[in-house]
Amino acid sequence: VTVVLSKAGWVRSAKGHEIDPNSLSYRGDDSLQDFARGKSNQLAVFLDSNGKAYSIPSHSLPSARGMGEPITGRLSADSGVKFVSASVGVDDDRFLIMNTGGYGYIAEYKNMISNKKSGRAFMRLPENAEMLKAIPVRKNHTHIAAVSNIGKLLIFEIDELPILGKGKGNKIINIPKDKLAAGEEFMAHAQLLATDS
């Protein structure tokens, strides 16, 4: 299945892996936020902007033939949070977990799962920071390239980040607190680099 999360927090699931999530129709000015490919018997894990992790069985999500449904109907999230990330995997699959404040760590899928509707505290965020999308880590990934909104680029070995069940993580890129608070500087994105890329 392909699990699709929209920017407005609507969720749905399409059969197979061939579907292009960008080609689906979205409500009004809503658009794609994130998607994940997996199996229908796996749990889909969603991260919100406050650093909480939630799980929903993939097979129970509404069909992508329609617009889906608001994820908040399935979960009891704090008011005003955005859902930023969708992931599907098996126990020891690894994901790069990061926030706009410049911190990150590697998490195993089994530690991202929550059996509570209210989710579980997963990443401790610096003040004024928000979660970024979780990025699947493959066996051949060796380096992380992190980029700030003002174009700072840092490339380092993936082994430099700890593997954690939850927590704050390590500083990936230096973001001054005052600039983060003012919205002037933040970690915008990271890319994983492989030995054969």
Report each predicted region and the residues it spans:
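Short, structured "edge-of-domain" segments at secondary-structure transitions
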Residues: V1-S197
